[in-house]
């Protein structure tokens, strides 16, 4: 009987940056929480010499091999050598590309790093990050009209981390705090071209988060973390969102990624509606 290991080697070989592989590898590996993957990431593998170094590593420490490689010769060499070594080898994107080709009836245009066009995607993300950082926590509210998404909510409803996550996906995101007794920025109330979303959470979760964060504000700690007071803040936030017709996302049981996914869905609908208005 083989002795069970609590780890395995995971090789990710790409002719581009490897981001696609890393995401796929982590997603699948997370389904096996009791076994720790030892990740070996090899980006920009585009010739036999580079590949041979990878194969030498696989030979020394066998494991699962995932790859995204366009060049057929390099691809076949990797697959062939993995078979010789006796390790599983999978082309992550091939099944998806084949489905697209079959459905669209058009051969795929094989292009190395096509999914990472620096002239569009990379600089769009950088621009979005710059904008989001400048518009964190109600800053620079005069040009909110340049935002794709504006997140509003009381303190500690994950506005900032969600904004940064969205910015990393190229979405210009501003966030504005909702504070009872303090007027909302005029620009926010007048904004029609940005999607405005309210974030809420349970009073219990917000209280817990507030207790474990440095306040950084001149407020009473007891009042700031008191659940009754937080419930009143949440009621105020919900009324504001309802008054202006802003959709609400409850982040109580959502990760940042799950909250962002909900934002993307709302943004898609919002843009479709705007497009229909134009047409």
Curated annotation (Swiss-Prot):
Domain of life where this protein originates: Bacteria
Function: Bifunctional serine/threonine kinase and phosphorylase involved in the regulation of the pyruvate, phosphate dikinase (PPDK) by catalyzing its phosphorylation/dephosphorylation.
Annotated EC: 2.7.11.32, 2.7.4.27
Lineage: Bacteria, Pseudomonadati, Pseudomonadota, Alphaproteobacteria, Hyphomicrobiales
NCBIfam families: PRK05339.1
Name of this chain's protein: Putative pyruvate, phosphate dikinase regulatory protein
Record organism: Bartonella bacilliformis (strain ATCC 35685 / KC583 / Herrer 020/F12,63)
S-adenosyl-L-methionine in keyword set: no
Keywords: Kinase, Nucleotide-binding, Serine/threonine-protein kinase, Transferase
UniProt KW Zinc keyword: no
């Amino acid at each position: 009987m083989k002795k069970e290991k609590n780890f395995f080697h995971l090789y990710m070989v790409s002719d581009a940056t490897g981001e696609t592989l890393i995401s796929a590898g982590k997603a699948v590996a997370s389904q096996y929480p009791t076994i720790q993957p030892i990740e070996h990431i090899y980006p920009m593998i585009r010739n036999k010499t580079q590949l041979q170094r990878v194969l030498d590593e696989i030979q020394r420490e066998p494991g699962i091999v995932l790859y995204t490689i366009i060049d057929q010769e390099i691809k076949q060499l990797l697959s062939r050598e993995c078979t010789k070594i006796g390790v599983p080898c999978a082309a992550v994107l091939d099944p998806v590309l084949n489905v697209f080709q079959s459905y669209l009836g058009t051969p795929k245009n094989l292009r190395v790093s096509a999914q990472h066009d620096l002239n569009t995607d990379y600089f769009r993300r950088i621009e979005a990050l710059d904008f989001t950082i400048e518009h964190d926590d109600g800053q620079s509210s005069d040009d909110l009209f340049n935002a794709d998404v504006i997140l509003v909510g009381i303190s500690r409803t994950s506005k900032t981390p969600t904004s940064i996550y969205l910015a990393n996906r190229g979405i210009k995101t501003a966030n504005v705090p909702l504070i009872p007794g303090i007027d909302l920025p005029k620009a926010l109330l007048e904004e029609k071209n940005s999607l405005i979303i309210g974030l809420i959470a349970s009073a219990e979760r917000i209280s817990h988060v507030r207790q474990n964060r440095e306040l950084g504000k001149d407020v009473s700690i007891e009042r700031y973390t008191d659940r009754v007071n937080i419930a009143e803040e949440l009621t105020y936030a919900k009324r504001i969102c309802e008054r202006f017709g802003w959709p609400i996302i409850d982040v109580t049981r959502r990760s940042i990624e799950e909250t962002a996914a909900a934002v993307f869905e709302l943004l898609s609908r919002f843009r479709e509606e705007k497009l229909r208005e134009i047409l």
